[in-house]
Amino acid sequence: MPKPDIHPNWYPDAKVICNGEVVMTTGSTQPELHVDVWSGNHPFFTGTQKILDTEGRVDRFMRKYGMGSADAAADEKKPDAKNNNKDNTSKED
């Protein structure tokens, strides 16, 4: 006999939403499911090639921890070759 009141609520008509449109209904423990890709717009099922515009993990990390963008951090790490050559030259006496 299962314990009462420990199981999640079941929504037999949960809406699956992709790009602001309801694309299908299914059963779930959530009343609404928000997805980026589903079988109606996935390149494998549609036979087309599509580049998904999703945020990269590094950019998300940088934004989350307030470090600016990943591109700015990469630019800061690159030393200027002209300045390094001047600083690293030694005078021979």
Swiss-Prot record:
An example molecular function term from Gene Ontology annotations: structural constituent of ribosome
Pfam families according to UniProt: Ribosomal_L31
Compositionally biased region (Basic and acidic residues): 74-93
Keywords: Ribonucleoprotein, Ribosomal protein, RNA-binding, rRNA-binding
Alphabetized HAMAP family for the sequence: Ribosomal_bL31_1
UniProt record similarity statement: Belongs to the bacterial ribosomal protein bL31 family. Type A subfamily.
Name this polypeptide is given: Large ribosomal subunit protein bL31
Organism whose genome encodes this protein: Prochlorococcus marinus (strain MIT 9313)
